[in-house]
Amino acid sequence: MLKILNMNEYISLNHYLILSSLVFTIGMFGLFMNRKNIINILMSIELMLLAVNINFVAFSVYMQELSGQIFSIIILTVAAAETAIGLAILLIYFRNKGSIKITDINKMRG
């Protein structure tokens, strides 16, 4: 007989937490290493947010509640809107100034 295995028999909560911490660390490393390009900074922040969402979903499945998964979907929706607005502002700034370097944007403060 063919036995259908549950995914949680092989992948425990610790595996998800390790994956999440690795993704968060990669995002943090990218944030610290690429401080001159705004697009790299936005991508690193999105990686860190993805790691948090992996934690929400993993704990939600572990506790057998849907609230973490629903919260994760809401966070992803807000993050997508935030990224779209940020990239639109960045595109307008690039059309006006011709550069998206952090040092050029800091000069706008006055």
From Swiss-Prot:
One of its GO terms (cellular component) is plasma membrane. It is a multi-pass membrane protein. GO terms for biological process: ATP synthesis coupled electron transport. InterPro entries: NADH_UbQ_OxRdtase_chain4L/K, NUOK/Mnh_C1-like. The keyword Iron-sulfur does not apply. Its EC number is 7.1.1.-. It is an enzyme of class 7 (translocase). It comes from the Bacteria. NDH-1 is composed of 14 different subunits. Subunits NuoA, H, J, K, L, M, N constitute the membrane sector of the complex. This is NADH-quinone oxidoreductase subunit K. It comes from Rickettsia prowazekii (strain Madrid E). The gene is nuoK.
